[in-house]
Curated annotation (Swiss-Prot):
Protein name, entry field: Transcription elongation factor GreA
Gene from which this protein is expressed: greA
Pfam families: GreA_GreB, GreA_GreB_N
SUPFAM superfamilies: FKBP-like, GreA transcript cleavage protein, N-terminal domain
Highest taxon listed in the record's lineage: Bacteria
Keyword presence, DNA-binding: yes
PROSITE patterns with a match to the protein in the record: GREAB_1, GREAB_2
Molecular function as annotated in GO: DNA binding; RNA polymerase binding
Length: 164
């Protein structure tokens, strides 16, 4: 498995997501009981409570699967050791389209990390921008395509391990 397939998480983020997963799993019997209670109310075709409970169950099961996959593929607390190369877990600074004044600083990681201060944007290594920057060295320019179809050039100014 390569680093771009691995989700880098801080210890705090991992613990928060694990607690959410544990809560959702613990809630399974409650949802099942709710569905059974609603089923006993009669005709299922006209039973809004039953359908709402089934909908909630589906949403919670989808979130459980998402969290399990995320946590199973997580690298916890292992920020890249090296500076100067954009890797998952790096805080990078870039400038756009040869305009050195148009800069942005962000973490290459996952929004699930919930960077606590809220001041640092997070771009997934699977996003167009994050993916374009993976393995870029300081001073290197890369291009990526935005959803509108336009191509944007970005140059890596700095890359440092995240110390959250």
């Amino acid at each position: 498995m390569t680093d771009t397939q691995v989700t880098w998480l801080t210890e705090e983020s991992y613990d928060r997501l694990k607690a959410e997963l544990d809560q959702l799993i613990a809630n399974r019997p409650v949802i099942a009981a709710e569905i059974n209670d609603r089923r006993e109310e009669g005709d299922l075709r006209e039973n809004g409570g039953y359908h709402a409970a089934r909908e909630q169950q589906g949403q919670e099961e989808a979130r459980i699967r998402q969290l399990q996959e995320l946590l199973n593929n997580a690298k916890v607390g292992e920020a890249p050791k090296q500076s100067g190369i954009a890797l998952p877990g790096s805080v990078v600074k870039v400038y756009y389209d040869d305009d050195e004044k148009d800069t942005e600083t962000f973490l290459i990681g996952t929004r699930e990390q919930g960077v606590s201060d809220g001041k640092l944007e997070v771009y997934s290594p699977n996003s167009p921008l994050g993916g374009a920057l993976i393995d870029a060295k300081v001073g290197e320019s890369r291009s990526y395509t935005v959803p509108s179809g336009n191509t944007v050039k970005v140059t890596l100014v700095s890359a440092e391990p995240y110390h959250g």
